[in-house]
Amino acid sequence: MADLKPYIAKAASGEPLPLGDAKAAFDIMMSGQATPSQIGGFLMALRVRGETVPEIAGAVASMRSRMIPVIAPDDAMDIVGTGGDQSGSYNVSSCTAFVVAGAGVPVAKHGNRALSSRSGAADALAALGINIEADADTIGRSISEAGLGFMFAPMHHSAMRHVGPSRVELGTRTIFNLLGPLSNPASVKRQLVGVFAPQWLEPLAHVLKELGSETAWVVYGDGLDEMTTAGTTQVAALENGQIRTFEITPEEVGLRRCSPAELKGGEAAENAKALLGVLEGKDSAYRDIVLLNSGAALVVAGKAENLKDGIAQAVQSIDSGAALAVLQKVIAVSNDKPA
């Protein structure tokens, strides 16, 4: 039986693990050969010292080697936040996914239940009536017929069951928050990824480049793991093999600046109701932040020329009823009913 203890000692000493060692350590954890306390100790040793790009890449390699894949079109994208930002905000990326799909871009959405917040993507989508435990074939059909499929992380990364209890007991963000957006079961090549701290912007853009992404924006919104309308958003954009950084304010793209309090969400049922309200065309700060993120996603997808163009397309997706129609189709297909 392989032993995690040498890797714990190495991480705790402050020494970075090479990619091969990181993969080996995650292979041990993902195959059930480590105790919950060993897993917790290893994850916190990495967090306190600070995870490195090779460690993240090694961990992703371990996860990808075990995942149940989903077939999606080549132009499909993911819109996902790492979580762990402690903001308790609405489910921005989930709502954004429907708007982007309504604008004609296939979305393979990867997500989980809440670990460090009150409502994760899976919690809100389940509250809306989506079967989050649909199998890979059904999800593939949902992407092709409805324009969006939701991939519930534990269904595709069953090896995660070995680390889940430790993550919940820790109750704080770990390297696994970084891994979810990098381990999409549909192997998408276009991503809008929100991170919980600005120091991860460029490292994650580099990891995505190493892992074969074509276009990606990694964003941090002044305390949110999404682009924000309550402050300034920092972006590390991977485009044409190059990574560039820039900032965006809501005013420069014609959106109203709101207060952080206006973006506060609640439990899953409350967040689901608010998400439905946005798709039904209700005006709110939640709608504005979804428009901003949708505009960016449409730029990443190559559907929009620039952010203002993307936001205009997002407005059309909502106001025409297209985004709401995507939700209704996904509910039907995920529950094995005709779209």
Curated annotation (Swiss-Prot):
SUPFAM superfamilies: Nucleoside phosphorylase/phosphoribosyltransferase catalytic domain, Nucleoside phosphorylase/phosphoribosyltransferase N-terminal domain
Glycosyltransferase keyword on record: yes
Entry binding sites for Mg(2+) 1: 93, 226
Positions contributing to Mg(2+) 2 binding: 225-226
Enzyme class: transferase
EC number(s) given by UniProt: 2.4.2.18
Binding site for anthranilate 2: 167
UniProt-annotated binding residues for 5-phospho-alpha-D-ribose 1-diphosphate: 81, 84-85, 89, 91-94, 109-117, 121
One Gene Ontology biological process: L-tryptophan biosynthetic process
Pathway: Amino-acid biosynthesis; L-tryptophan biosynthesis; L-tryptophan from chorismate: step 2/5
Molecular functions per Gene Ontology: anthranilate phosphoribosyltransferase activity; magnesium ion binding
A GO cellular component annotation in the UniProt record: cytosol
Ligand binding (anthranilate 1): 81, 112
Cofactor comment text: Binds 2 magnesium ions per monomer.
Cofactor(s) listed: Mg(2+)
Catalytic reaction list: N-(5-phospho-beta-D-ribosyl)anthranilate + diphosphate = 5-phospho-alpha-D-ribose 1-diphosphate + anthranilate
UniProt cross-references to PANTHER family, sorted A to Z: ANTHRANILATE PHOSPHORIBOSYLTRANSFERASE
General function of this protein: Catalyzes the transfer of the phosphoribosyl group of 5-phosphorylribose-1-pyrophosphate (PRPP) to anthranilate to yield N-(5'-phosphoribosyl)-anthranilate (PRA).
Subunit structure: Homodimer.
Family, as annotated: Belongs to the anthranilate phosphoribosyltransferase family.
The protein's name: Anthranilate phosphoribosyltransferase
Record lineage: Bacteria, Pseudomonadati, Pseudomonadota, Alphaproteobacteria, Hyphomicrobiales
